[in-house]
From Swiss-Prot:
<dbReference type="InterPro" id="IPR023962">
    <property type="entry name" value="Phosphoketolase"/>
</dbReference>
<dbReference type="InterPro" id="IPR018970">
    <property type="entry name" value="Xul5P/Fru6P_PKetolase_N"/>
</dbReference>
<dbReference type="Pfam" id="PF03894">
    <property type="entry name" value="XFP"/>
</dbReference>
<comment type="similarity">
    <text>Belongs to the XFP family.</text>
</comment>
<keyword id="KW-0456">Lyase</keyword>
<dbReference type="GO" id="GO:0016832">
    <property type="term" value="F:aldehyde-lyase activity"/>
</dbReference>
<dbReference type="InterPro" id="IPR019790">
    <property type="entry name" value="Xul5P/Fru6P_PKetolase_CS"/>
</dbReference>
<keyword id="KW-0786">Thiamine pyrophosphate</keyword>
<dbReference type="InterPro" id="IPR019789">
    <property type="entry name" value="Xul5P/Fru6P_PKetolase_ThDP_BS"/>
</dbReference>
<dbReference type="GO" id="GO:0005975">
    <property type="term" value="P:carbohydrate metabolic process"/>
</dbReference>
<dbReference type="Pfam" id="PF09364">
    <property type="entry name" value="XFP_N"/>
</dbReference>
<dbReference type="Pfam" id="PF09363">
    <property type="entry name" value="XFP_C"/>
</dbReference>
<dbReference type="InterPro" id="IPR018969">
    <property type="entry name" value="Xul5P/Fru6P_PKetolase_C"/>
</dbReference>
<protein>
    <recommendedName>
        <fullName>Probable phosphoketolase</fullName>
        <ecNumber>4.1.2.-</ecNumber>
    </recommendedName>
</protein>
<dbReference type="InterPro" id="IPR005593">
    <property type="entry name" value="Xul5P/Fru6P_PKetolase"/>
</dbReference>
<dbReference type="InterPro" id="IPR029061">
    <property type="entry name" value="THDP-binding"/>
</dbReference>
<dbReference type="InterPro" id="IPR009014">
    <property type="entry name" value="Transketo_C/PFOR_II"/>
</dbReference>
């Protein structure tokens, strides 16, 4: 039986750590000749990279932690995966996966011999190779850690509903200063040890950032303990006065990590066997504070140049100077080669590797085997079970729209709220997928009309519940929205999605912008993952923009920002789907599609306020499938017939106003031939240069079928910023666009006045339509002038009523559709 705490075993662990750290340091500088001292081959200029790139400072600390995580897996037969918050030390995951064989399984050309090791060294941070972070190219990684702050949020999402898994989550002490990371310490208030896995957070307290000390590093152990105990954790420390007494570190780390794992197991046992922690008691989850110096074991001082301090060069080890490349060594500058050789040989590589590049026999069995290897844990590659959700038939939840009631408000007000219509569908999904679907949000689920979900589930919340002051809160539930943090909600969803489950994150449209950058990072991950043949795909990430810009008359200007549409439109279109359904049926049909799509970001803009319902189930299905459709009942031109102008819209309020505008024109000039186009999927309109943009793009012929040849007037009511549609039509080479979107004007005002602020309203759209008809000699001057004057007088009346009485003119807000004159 293996004695995992014996000196012999810890010495083997130390050797494995040295092997990993040797490789992690060497690949920054060398592109070949990786075992120069073992093979007796002196380093030449051609062996070195011309421009070494990488981060050394965090590597040795993280390989130390990775080695001890392997020990825990072996000792406790524990399923575990590694998450590196300070992900710029990418070698800390690349190298362990190479040593345990996972890397070679993913990349067969990177063999576990001298030739394969040389290839690995060359490709690291090298053109055409791999990045310096824990990218999607790295086996075992599901968190790149390039943009700091999300490791605990991702870890939480990853272990929800996975009771057998532990996330070994390393938090950089610089990362710990970010807002998202600081708020994510609260994640333990939402983890139920009865049904979920666990996180073992390790604060990698190496002391320094790029050029500054870290706040936690200059905080006493006593105060750090108070801080984490106040958050509900049970802190324990790994530190030693002599930073080079590595065996002392190993012995202490083994004791600390053993106690941490045993505490986690006891917490889970108490919850699962005795139903503990289900009444407001939060477990004292362990956290490990590891003071592992930056650049640990690397060059200690700059003895070759620069100023001196106490007779020595400026410190590198345990200093910010170790952050990136600690030596100015390259193929063009070999002045510090002796220091590099001294550094690398300090790991005694001849005791770790054979001359053929293989690992010494005694070290080959140190790493776990098969799927117990952290780099081969299925959780990190699309999940243990990444199948799509079991979906109900969305049409069973649809509104009964027909030609008799389209464009009108339905008798039950709740049926006119698209988000409430969606909530019925989501509630059924919860029942069909009790452990594989979750809804996340920042305290907005009730506000965003997911009312029906609360009939079948609760919010998951582990703190004390105080009824009747609290509502729909329980230790078990499929909704997690009780922390007011968009970062947390998005991070939880990303972790949940990247481990093969499906969820959605709904937020106020303007404040979804808080996680712009997180969505960018997720896009970059799935884009890069798609290039890795060994990687499985993922469920799509579903984000819902609601409480939208034209429905924020009550909260005002700060709550008005539809810019997420523009932000995501800039990304590679093959990975982005942006939907603007105009009613409840189309929203249902869109989600039926979104939940079946893979490795996409689905951004759905949805209305939560009572609005007219427009489309039959068949029309909604076509709109969701095709992303765009000509609506015959709102057009006066027949299919294939030349038109005088095109009306188009995308979004709930734009659709109402554009349809009302064309109705106004039709009432006075029924001879006008126009086509109405409803756009649901924005990406169908785009025509972008470069690869990975064409998956859903309309051909030029298809685009012309909808919008006519260049020069055809197009009145476009749009939910977002106008320049997005303008840029799309510019790329299409289509002149004649007049877009009415959000113009960054708004306030606390009336519902209809919000539309007038940006001239999205029907009257401004109708004025533009009549003007182009007049300019193109489709209508006489007298008729056009009279119509335009009437529209302007109506707008003046609107202004007077809203400013004097604080209400809208009922004719505007209560308008309903009636058949066109044809």
């Amino acid at each position: 039986m293996t004695e995992y705490n014996s000196e012999a075993y810890l010495k083997k662990l130390d050797k494995w750590w040295r092997a990993a750290t040797y490789l992690g340091a060497g690949m920054i500088f060398l592109k070949e000749n990786p075992l120069f001292s073992v093979t007796g081959t002196p380093i030449k200029a051609e062996n070195l990279k011309a421009n070494p790139i990488g981060h050394w400072g965090t590597v040795s600390g993280q390989t130390f932690l990775y080695a001890h995580a392997n020990r825990l897996i072996n000792k406790y037969d524990q399923k575990m995966f590694y998450m590196g918050g300070p992900g710029h030390g990418g070698q800390a995951m690349v190298v362990p996966s190479y040593l345990d064989g996972s890397y070679t399984e993913a990349y067969p050309e990177i063999t576990q011999d001298l030739e394969g090791m040389s290839r690995l060294f060359k490709r690291f941070s090298f053109p055409g190779g791999i990045g310096s972070h824990m990218t999607a190219q790295t086996p075992g990684s599901l968190h790149e850690g390039g943009e700091l702050g999300y490791v605990l949020s991702h870890a939480t999402g990853a272990i929800l509903d996975q009771p057998e898994q532990i996330a070994f989550a390393v938090v950089g002490d610089g990362e710990a200063e970010t807002g998202p990371l600081m708020t994510s310490w609260h994640s333990i208030k939402f983890i139920n040890p009865k049904n979920d896995g666990a996180i073992l957070p390790i604060l990698d307290l190496n002391g320094f950032k790029i050029s500054n000390p870290t706040l936690f590093a200059r905080t006493s152990d006593v105060d750090i303990r108070k801080f984490f105990e106040g958050l509900g954790y049970s802190p324990r420390y790994i530190e030693n006065d002599d930073i080079h007494d590595y065996m002392a570190y190993h012995k202490l780390a083994a004791e600390v990590f053993d106690k941490a794992i045993e505490d986690i197991h006891q917490i889970q046992k108490d919850a699962r066997e005795d139903n503990r922690y289900q009444n407001g008691e939060i477990p004292a989850w362990p956290i490990v504070i590891a003071r592992l110096p930056k650049g640990w074991g690397g060059p200690r001082y700059n003895d070759w140049s620069g100023p001196k301090f106490d007779g020595k060069g400026m410190p590198i080890e345990h200093s910010f100077r170790a952050h990136q490349v600690p030596l100015p060594l390259s193929s063009k500058n070999m002045g510090t080669l002796p220091e590099f050789v001294k550094w690398m040989t300090s790991y005694q590589p001849e005791t770790l590797f054979n001359a053929d590049g293989s690992l010494k026999e005694e070290l080959r069995d140190f790493a776990p085997k098969g799927e117990m290897r952290m780099a081969s844990n299925p959780v990190t590659n699309g999940g243990v079970d990444s199948s799509n959700l079991v979906l109900p038939d969305w049409q069973e939840f649809a509104n009964p729209i027909s030609e008799n009631n389209r464009g009108k408000l339905l008798p039950d007000t709740n049926d006119n709220m698209d988000m409430n219509v969606l909530s019925k569908y989501f509630a059924e999904i919860v029942k069909l997928n009790p452990t594989r679907f979750r809804l996340f949000g920042p305290d907005e689920t009730m506000s965003n009309r997911f009312w029906e979900m609360f009939k079948v589930t609760n919010r998951q919340w582990m703190q004390v519940i105080k009824n009747p002051n609290d509502e729909f809160i329980s230790p078990e539930g499929r909704i997690i929205d009780s922390q007011l943090s968009e970062h947390q909600a998005e991070g939880w969803l990303e972790g949940y999605t990247l481990t093969g489950r499906t969820g959605a994150f709904a937020s106020y449209e303007s404040f979804l912008r808080v996680v712009d950058s997180m969505l960018t990072q997720h896009f970059k991950w799935i884009r890069q993952a798609a290039d890795q043949k060994w990687r499985h795909d993922y469920p799509s990430l579903n984000v819902i923009s609601t409480s939208t810009v034209f429905q924020q008359d009550h909260n005002g200007y700060t709550h008005q920002d539809p810019g997420m549409l523009t932000h995501l439109a800039e990304k590679k279109s093959d990975f982005i789907r942006q939907y603007l359904p105009a009613d409840g049926n189309t929203l249902l049909a869109v989600f039926d599609r979104a939940f079946q799509d893979r490795s996409k970001i689905n951004h759905i803009v949805a209305s939560k306020q009572p609005r007219q319902q427009w489309f039959t189930k068949e029309e909604a299905e076509k709109l969701a499938t095709d992303g765009i459709a000509t609506i015959d009942w709102a057009s006066t031109a027949k299919d294939g017939e030349a038109v005088d102008l095109v009306f188009a819209s995308a979004g709930a309020e734009p659709t109402i106003e554009t349809l009302a505008a064309l109705h106004l024109v039709n009432e006075v000039f029924p001879q006008a031939k126009f086509r109405y186009v409803n756009v649901v999927e924005l990406g169908r309109l785009q025509k972008k240069k470069g690869a990975l943009n064409q998956e859903r793009e309309l051909s030029d012929e298809e685009f012309e079928k909808y919008f006519g040849p260049s020069g055809t007037p197009v009145i476009f009511g749009f939910h977002g910023y106008e320049d997005l549609i303008e840029s799309i039509f510019y790329q299409r080479g289509h002149d004649g666009l007049i877009v009415h979107g959000y113009r960054e004007d708004g306030d606390i005002t009336t519902t209809y006045d919000m539309r007038v602020y940006s001239e999205l309203d029907r009257f401004h759209q109708a004025i533009d339509a009549m003007q182009v008809l007049y300019v193109n000699r489709k209508v006489n001057q007298g008729l056009a002038k009279a119509f335009i004057d009437r529209m302007k007088r109506t707008l003046v009346k609107h202004f007077e009523v809203t400013r004097n009485e604080g209400v809208d003119i009922p004719d505007f807000t209560e308008w309903v559709w009636s058949d066109l004159k044809k």
